[in-house]
């Protein structure tokens, strides 16, 4: 069913609001994907707070006009699903992980930090650990010397007690 003008304006406004908050946009061709698989992809995207939507390319072009993602308009051809996220790597990670298990989803392009990326660029972005993973690694690295020092002090205290007894 075709959208009337008001519906199109509402879609453009909704997508523009998402794009205004976004750090990353990923485009992927979804030709031939089963409905059940697409539903799984949408569920994974929701878990990661990724806005995932199939859009008419003309509406998507209007939504990205005047944003850092405007250069992506050249890539907006064919049946595309758009992944938009505030997290720098979430959209790339969700789409890339799903494309590994489903060869019918083909990453076409992406944009991060005002730069357009090809498939290899999106895959490289997806391979970066998330902020939470990096923070946990940093905490482990910072905690390791402290815990080693504490164990050394405890061993020294036990040794002193053994000598005193």
Swiss-Prot record:
Q: Name one Pfam family in it.
A: Ribosomal_L10
Keyword terms: Ribonucleoprotein, Ribosomal protein, RNA-binding, rRNA-binding
Q: Which GO terms describe its molecular function?
A: large ribosomal subunit rRNA binding
* GO terms for cellular component: ribonucleoprotein complex; ribosome
One GO BP on record is: translation
Q: Which SUPFAM superfamilies match?
A: Ribosomal protein L10-like
Q: Give the protein's function.
A: Forms part of the ribosomal stalk, playing a central role in the interaction of the ribosome with GTP-bound translation factors.
| Family, per entry | Belongs to the universal ribosomal protein uL10 family.
Cite the PANTHER family for this sequence: 39S RIBOSOMAL PROTEIN L10, MITOCHONDRIAL
Record text on subunit structure and interactions:
Part of the ribosomal stalk of the 50S ribosomal subunit. The N-terminus interacts with L11 and the large rRNA to form the base of the stalk. The C-terminus forms an elongated spine to which L12 dimers bind in a sequential fashion forming a multimeric L10(L12)X complex.
What is the name attached to this protein's record?
Answer: Large ribosomal subunit protein uL10
Q: Which organism is it from?
A: Burkholderia lata (strain ATCC 17760 / DSM 23089 / LMG 22485 / NCIMB 9086 / R18194 / 383)
């Amino acid at each position: 069913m075709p959208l009337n003008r008001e519906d199109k304006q509402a879609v453009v406004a909704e997508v523009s609001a998402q794009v205004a908050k976004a750090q990353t946009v990923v485009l992927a061709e979804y030709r031939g994907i089963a409905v059940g698989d697409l539903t799984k992809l949408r569920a994974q995207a929701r878990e990661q707070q990724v806005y995932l939507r199939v859009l008419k390319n003309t509406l998507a072009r209007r939504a990205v006009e005047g944003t850092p993602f405007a250069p992506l308009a050249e890539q907006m051809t064919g049946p595309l699903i758009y992944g938009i996220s505030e997290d720098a790597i979430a959209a790339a990670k969700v789409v890339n992980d799903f494309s590994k298990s489903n060869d019918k989803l083909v990453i076409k392009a992406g944009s991060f930090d005002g730069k357009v990326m090809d498939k290899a660029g999106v895959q490289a972005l997806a391979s970066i650990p998330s902020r939470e993973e990096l923070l946990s690694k940093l905490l482990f690295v910072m905690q390791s010397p402290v815990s080693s020092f504490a164990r050394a002090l405890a061993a020294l205290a036990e040794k002193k007690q053994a000598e005193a007894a």
